[in-house]
Amino acid sequence: MARWPRGEVEIERLLGLKHLQAVTGAAANGQSLLEKAHRTLGTASSITANDPDSAFVLAYDAARYAATALLAQQGLRPTTAGGHIAVESAIRAQFGDGFRSFGFLRRRRNELEYPSAGTTTSDIDEATDAVAQSRSIIEAADQLLPNLSFFS
């Protein structure tokens, strides 16, 4: 199987900036991260009514695990320098607008975790929507993961 062709230029750019790095061995198996995404989403869903802020953050974490699983399956992982933005850039470049909500989840999670101005709490409706968006990302990752090979 050849590497995923869409987004090659962006992945090469992120590697050059050291925002992504190559990994091998167990670190290049995205399945365990995808399983963690499913578990985390279940937890987020179960606490939405009682703790919307935490549910939102967990929904984002679940989406991030799924996105990182797609990178891992290609022998890639974000570095500390690249962080969550590198994950967003890579998956959007490779897999398109189906992952657009990841950016919103990431930005809103930052607002909740590091409040400065504006709405610094979530509510049940927003948390429920975050769980649904995360579920869509995870379902897409479930479909994509078996079709990915090393980016080399």
Where are these regions (language model features)?
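Terminal alpha-helical segments
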Residues: 1-152
